[in-house]
Amino acid sequence: MTELKRVLGFGNILGLAIASIMGTGMFFGTAVGASYSGNASILSWVLLSIVAVYISTFFGELVAMFPRAGGVYEFSKQTYNRFTSFMIGWLAWLVGNLTTALLIVAAIDYLIPDPSQYIIKMIISVILIIILNIIAFHGIEASGFIVTVLAILSISIILSVIFPGIFFMDLSNLTPFFAFGTVPVFITMFFIAESFFGWESVTYLSEETVNPEKIIPKALVYGTMIVGILATILAVVSLGIAPYQDLIVTPAPLSLVFEHIYGAFGQILNYGVFIALIGSAAGGIITMPRLILALARDKLFISQLSDIHPRYKTPYKAIIFQAAISLIVFGMAFGRYRTLLSLLLPLGLIMYIFIILTIPILRKKYPDIKRSFKVPFVKIGPYLVVGFLFSLMVLWIVTEPNAWQILKLGLSFVSIGIPIYLLLEIYYDPDFIVKVNDSLAYFTLLTEKIILPKPVRKEILTLLGNIRNKTLLEFGCSVGTLTLDLAENVKPGGRVYATDLSEKDLMITHNRMTKRGHRHIIIIHDEHQVNRVHPDIPPVDAIVSIGMMGYLQDVKKVLREMKELVPYGGKIVFVDYVDFFKMIPNVAWLSNDATIEKLFREAGFSVFVTRKKGLFWNYVFVYGIKSQRDIPYV
């Protein structure tokens, strides 16, 4: 199996850490913060920088313990249950997409401040997203190099303000300092917190980093310190050069500062800010597919997205998927910087609260695991930070008029993950499959004509041919929809062995057969059907199975056992559901006809594969005969 390639060193990871953590706050945060607390926002930057450096140590310890591509999902998996870890992974993915959209919106606003140039701004943004994803597709070396260069450029832009800007400061602009009082200082910290979002992005590259246990923790801490120091000094210089009353009404705040320092030439530096923000967006575009990869590996996302490109060693399917999602999210969020920021912040803080709490839990759960990097003050520190972040959210809800509505909107996006999780578990988890089938047994009965319509049943019977007086195995009979047809067609001397995972499905099937007097139908409950054919099944003339291929955990074993039951030339007909709602595929091997044919051929069957369109999903038909040779079957 193709694996990710370890090529990233400390310089690449540090550059990525700076680019990912920096966010839009470095370039918009001074004005956003000043709009809430005036010059006292400087104090917000100082306090938040200290907290941010401490939070970076949590990610450092976690990646030192679990240096895997899943990052926050992997940490949650080791700490919480399967559902919670998926939801945190889903939340991290939402936060990542919102962050990328926010960065690109901010970048375009610096490049083209005129809001009337909507079409041009949209076209440039789409082209940029596509280019960045193409770079990510073609290898982590090129991606890492570009992000590192852009991080250096970002620092250069900030330094081009700080050092000459010191000599243009008017200290009278910094007074009065507490023009709005002290409470707004904490509200400000909520709104500039995005300036330090992004630690999780670096952890997604653990499997592509040389010696990640040591390199990534150091890069996270150093990167956060660099961003914190630069952001704080930039805020001091900006507020010293331009009164906060002017900054807060400027669409691109640093442009005003550039103009004070460099005059008309300062407008050129807007292009530098644009490139720097795109560099931060690139960090998310490069790293987020690794989160999808980790979820797909654990069958908590579409399994096909875990594939690694044999040449470029990148999760190319996840990158393509992520590119499409990025374009959709950007299209929905275009031109709404303040709304995006308000939506992103509470979701990000909720995610970080869950991640911070993993440290004290894992210290107790795995006390002996090797930790090359440790969080200081672990007995009280995590709880103080969680309390601090939670209090910022409460303060935001209390003071901002629309905060509660925005939070509910954000949580509604998070809640979409619940049905997705249930759907994925139905696909992949045998125990969950049984529970769901049992709970939905009567619903399945009510909707059987939709789930298995008459034309599909007729096609199956046609493929089976003449089954009069034959013995059949129906592998997965559900509520007996097809069983009723089989029962009539094998008369007068035939039999049908109907097996299923669900006891409730079988109870319904039994009642239906009894009501119609079909005593030649033998019903067998098999809770292990995803891994075997029930041992009580005798030799049969043919095998038919509906909707079971996607559930099989050991396909080859089940097919080999079926081969032993049918005579040479004995027929098999398998039908399964794919492309649910025309967009959600089934398990990976059912997506490729050649793979299906190969699996059946290796088990001793010569089969033909066809696909037919349905209303809510499509059908894949696999039919053929037991054969020692790979002969065409018609």
Model regions and ranges:
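Helix-loop-helix connectors at the membrane interface of multi-pass transporters/channels
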Residues: 1, 74-79, 103-124, 157, ...
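Membrane-interface "cap" regions at the ends of multi-pass membrane proteins
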Residues: 1-29, 36-40, 53-57, 69
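Helix-loop-helix junctions that connect adjacent transmembrane segments
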Residues: 3-4, 39-42, 115-120, 148-271
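Hydrophobic transmembrane alpha-helices that form the core helical bundles
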Residues: 32-36, 44, 53-129, 133-137, ...
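TM-loop-TM module centered on a large, flexible mid-protein loop between adjacent transmembrane helices
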Residues: 74-75, 81, 113-116, 189, ...
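Membrane-interface loop-to-helix entry segments
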Residues: 108, 121-168, 179-182, 220-225, ...
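C-terminal membrane-solvent junction of multi-pass transporters and transport-like membrane proteins
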Residues: 146, 305-312, 352-402
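A generic transmembrane alpha-helix motif of multi-pass inner-membrane proteins
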Residues: 379-435
